[in-house]
Amino acid sequence: MSKLIELSVSGQVLRLNCPPEQHDALRQAAHLLDNRVMEMRERTGILQMEKILSIVALNLSFELMQEQQKTQTIENVINQKIAQLEGSLENILAQKTTF
């Protein structure tokens, strides 16, 4: 069951409904976003919140894509290793059944 949560990002209060078990993670995400916005504002000197949020969103999206690519690469390597192990096991079992 969803429950109302209030979050603050760059001085703006956001009220969202989400399951209580997700409240802590959502607070952490809001804190991360708030920090990124402050860092971007300090680093670039841009004052327009819409522009800052767009840049931060683009950066976070790019980071997410990179992590997804890493995960996919790792999954591919694991699947290759599993296939190799299965092949080795099949060879061993085939050798044992011929004796």
Swiss-Prot record:
It comes from the Bacteria. Its main location: cytoplasm. One of its GO terms (biological process) is division septum assembly. Residues 76-96 form a coiled coil. GO terms for cellular component: cell division site; cell septum; cytosol. The keyword Coiled coil applies. Keywords: Cell cycle, Cell division, Coiled coil, Cytoplasm, Septation. Belongs to the ZapA family. Type 1 subfamily. Homodimer. Interacts with FtsZ. This is Cell division protein ZapA. It comes from Histophilus somni (strain 2336) (Haemophilus somnus). The gene is zapA.
